[in-house]
């Protein structure tokens, strides 16, 4: 399994570098970033960390969960000043992705892995909060029950028509 060390971490993109290289969804990511409001108590908690905390993020610009969650991390890092974020493109860093497979088999992103200054891992966030996953699954079940023409419930969401996917994920 790949070990994360200071040298490997340093090869990742900064948040601004990641945004600059995006070829898709940059407007959506920046709109989400503009909407993010960090609670003052949360911001103070991050500012008071014995830092720095190094955050390795696995991301791709086509992923809706990345577009939703990465702006929160980017803004928090900028405002708190204690998070050192480096972003690695999942599809170009399969060795890192193998370390953080969701349920041991899925290449879910984003992944945010948190490390102390000795690069000992202290926590991992994968994809999205469980409550969001549950809510999305329920919405998809309802949608497929109401619209059998969209295929079976278990069909991948990317097979749905774009306007339908947008409706499902917006709710």
Cite the ranges covered by each PLM segment.
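Non-globular targeting/processing and membrane-anchoring segments
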Residues: 1-53, 74-84, 90, 97-108, ...
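Short glycine-rich or small-residue beta-strand-to-loop segments that form or flank ligand, phosphate
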Residues: 54-60
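Short, solvent-exposed coil/turn elements at secondary-structure transition points
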Residues: 61, 91-93
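Conserved redox-active cysteine motifs that mediate thiol-disulfide chemistry
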Residues: 61-68
């Amino acid at each position: 399994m790949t070990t994360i060390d200071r040298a490997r971490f340093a090869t990742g993109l900064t948040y601004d570098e990641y945004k600059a290289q995006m070829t898709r969804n940059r407007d959506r990511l920046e709109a989400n970033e503009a909407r993010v409001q960090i609670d003052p108590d949360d911001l103070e908690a991050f500012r008071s960390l014995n830092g720095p905390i190094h955050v390795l993020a696995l991301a791709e610009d086509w992923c809706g969960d990345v577009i939703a969650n990465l702006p929160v991390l980017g803004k928090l890092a900028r405002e708190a000043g204690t998070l050192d974020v480096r972003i690695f493109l999942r599809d170009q860093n399969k060795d890192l992705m193998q370390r953080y497979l969701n349920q041991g088999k899925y290449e879910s992103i984003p992944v945010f892995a948190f490390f102390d200054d000795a690069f000992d891992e202290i926590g991992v966030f994968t994809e999205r909060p469980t409550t969001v996953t549950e809510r999305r699954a329920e919405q998809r079940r309802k949608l497929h029950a109401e619209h059998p023409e969209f295929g079976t419930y278990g069909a991948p969401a990317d097979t749905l028509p774009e306007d339908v996917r947008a409706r499902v994920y917006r709710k």
